[in-house]
Amino acid sequence: MSKEPGLQDAIAKLADVVDARRADFEAGRVDPETSYIVRLFTKGDDAILKKIGEEAAEMVMAAKDSRYANLDPEKQAKLVGEVADLWFHCFVALSQFNLRPEDVIAELNRRAGI
């Protein structure tokens, strides 16, 4: 029986992929046309931050749609997808600023007194 990956595994794996793409970008190893992540890094801070704003707005709209639809499973699934998009783009921003999700987790733990 295989162990199902947990939240920490998924976060670390995705952050590793984003960081690897950033390294590829910095070394000029990947054509931005073949990698969405590299394309974001190529466009720079403003484009990455703008994308986070767009994804945050889409998440808010999906949450409102879910609430107005009495938490309909399809609307809930849309909300989950939008949160995933937002988190993904936040991981890109963290990498852009030489940070990792673990830095955010450490801050959350500090706030929780852990």
Question: What are the language-model segments listed below?
Answer:
Residues 1-83, 87-114:
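Flexible "arm" and connector segments at domain edges
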